[in-house]
C-alpha cells in the first residue's frame, strides 16, 4: 500500500467525524491555529526564505517569486483571512428549501460537506492556509499537493496547523500534505475515487490541463486569467488610467491581473499617450497596428492576445465599439474576469450581460476577483467552469446537498 493511500484513508475516516463537529469547536480550532501560526511565524519565514532562494537560483522571474514570497505583512493578511472565516456562517446542515407533500411527507434540501477535497496548487504557500481554513469551516478534510518550489514553506505551515489542531477538539488527521514532489504521485492522486470526493487544480494552464486530462476523480476547474479591460468612448480617462495601472502593476503574477487593454477608437489618440506615460519604464507594451500609429509599442501577434503573461507586459488593441471589444474577449478570454470603463449606462449593462466570465466589472479593477476581496476570508480557487461553482470558491461552494425526507409510515402506492 502506498503512503498516499494511507494518507487518504486517514482523511476519509476523519471526514465522517468532522461533519459532526460543532461550529463552536471548529471556530475554536481555527483560533488555536492562528495562535500556532503566530508562534511559528519566524520558522515559517525562515523556511520560505529557503524556497525563495532556490527559486532565484533557478532563474525564476520576479513576478513568480513574488507569488512564492511570504512576509510578516502577508502572514498577518493570512491570519486576518482566518478571522474572517471564523466570523462567517457555517455553511453545512442548513435546510434552505422545506416543503410538505399532500401525503404528509416533509422534504428538505440540506447542505452537507463534500467530504475529502484534494487541491493541487503552485507556488503560493498562502493557499495552504486558505484552503485548509475553508475546508475545516465547511466540514471537509483536505489533501494538499503544493509545488516543489514551496515545499519547505508548506511543510512548516502544515506542521503549525497540526500543532494547533492537537490543542483543539478536531483531529489533526483532517489535513494531509503530499511531500513527494514526483508528478507520478499526482497521477495516482487523480484516480483515488474511493477516497477523494473532488479535486481542485489551482495554477497555470499546463497544470490544469494535466489534471483535467488524467483525473477520474471529479474536478472543479480553475482557469487561467487572460483578463481584459475595455475603455469605452465615454470613460473617465483618469479613472481608466488608475484602474489599468492597478490591474497590471500591483501584482502582475496573479490570475486576476489585466493582460490586455481594449481602447475605443474615438478616445485612442488622447488616451493611449496617457496610458503609455503612466506605464513608462514599468510595463512593456505590445500593440495592434492602430495602437503603434499613436504610441511606441512592440508588435502584438495572435499569440499575444491569448497570452496570460503574469508579468509586466500589456497587450493593447484599438477597437471600433463595444461589440468589437466583446468579440475580442469572446475569442481570447478565459472566462475569468473582464471589465469595462464607461459612463454610459446602456453600454455598461450590455457588457455585463454579454460577456461570459466568472466576474464582470464596471469601473473597477479586475484585481478584486479574490475570495478575500469578496469577503469570503479566502478561496479554494477561482472556478471558470459553470457547474457546481463559479468564481472565487468560498465556504458556500464547498458543500453539496442531500434530501431529507421525514414521514410517519407513508408507503408508495
From Swiss-Prot:
It holds the Pfam family Aldedh. Its EC number is 1.2.1.41. Keywords: Amino-acid biosynthesis, Cytoplasm, NADP, Oxidoreductase, Proline biosynthesis. It is an enzyme of class 1 (oxidoreductase). Gene3D superfamilies: Aldehyde Dehydrogenase, Chain A, domain 1, Aldehyde Dehydrogenase, Chain A, domain 2. InterPro entries: Ald_DH/histidinol_DH, Ald_DH_C, Ald_DH_N, Aldehyde_DH_dom, G-glutamylP_reductase_CS, Glu-5-SA_DH, GPR_dom. The keyword Transmembrane helix does not apply. It is found in: Cytoplasm. CDD domains: ALDH_F18-19_ProA-GPR. Catalyzes the NADPH-dependent reduction of L-glutamate 5-phosphate into L-glutamate 5-semialdehyde and phosphate. The product spontaneously undergoes cyclization to form 1-pyrroline-5-carboxylate. NCBIfam families: PRK00197.1, proA. Belongs to the gamma-glutamyl phosphate reductase family. PANTHER family: DELTA-1-PYRROLINE-5-CARBOXYLATE SYNTHASE, GLUTAMATE SEMIALDEHYDE DEHYDROGENASE. This is Gamma-glutamyl phosphate reductase. It comes from Alkaliphilus oremlandii (strain OhILAs). The gene is proA.
